[in-house]
Amino acid sequence: KKMEPMPNRTIHQNWYEPPVLGPDENGLWNIDFHGGDLKGIEETIKYLKSLCVTIIYLSPIVRSQSTHRYDAADYEEVDPYAGTNEGLKSLCDAAHRNGMKVILDGVFNHTGNDSKYFNEYGTFDTLGAYQSTESPYYNFYKRIWNQGKRDFSFWWGMKNLPECDGNSPEWRNYILGEGGIIDQWFALGIDGLRLDVADELTDSFIEGINQAVKRNK
């Protein structure tokens, strides 16, 4: 399918075009896309079955700014470059018809700074945690003392990955609560989760994930 560029993201028509941003003195920005989507995976189901594949594990597919998508911008929406929520359901249905299960990568330790939750650059029409303490997402994030003032905590110091607070009732309800993100993903047909940086999630948050999964399976 034809993919329409989103702000600050680039679609390449062939593998030989150089990346738009970098590498330079600031490194390489992961915003260059070369295609590939959920529909393409669905179209290969019969081939995968012939290889005796029984599980399809997908790295993050939610809307994000980067190619790796470990910087979630919106957990409720499949990244338009990967497809749609309906496309995910279609893939899961096709997998199940062919004796396969689908596992998603759950990235719940942090979001992206360019997200509807943090919204550092004002990309989204939401009041982000970066913008105001009045944001409905403000309590999603960890805060620490930094040089005598209260600041957000970032995963391994990476300023594009603000850390979420696993003890925050608001964050827990959004991800773990009834009708929350995990429920929404399972409603689309997924069979399980792989947890990113699980060692950095709180025990109680992991237990909450376990309960949410059992509620759906």
Place the predicted regions along the sequence by residue.
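Substrate-binding/active-site clefts of carbohydrate-active enzymes
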Residues: 2-54, 61-188, 209-214
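Residue-level recognition of beta-strand->loop/alpha-helix junctions
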Residues: 57-60, 196
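Acidic-and-aromatic substrate-binding clefts and catalytic sites of carbohydrate-active enzymes
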Residues: 80-82, 198-207
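Short catalytic-loop micro-motif centered on adjacent basic/acidic residues
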Residues: 103, 192-198
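P-loop/Walker A phosphate-binding loop and immediately adjacent motor/lid segment at beta-alpha junctions
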Residues: 217
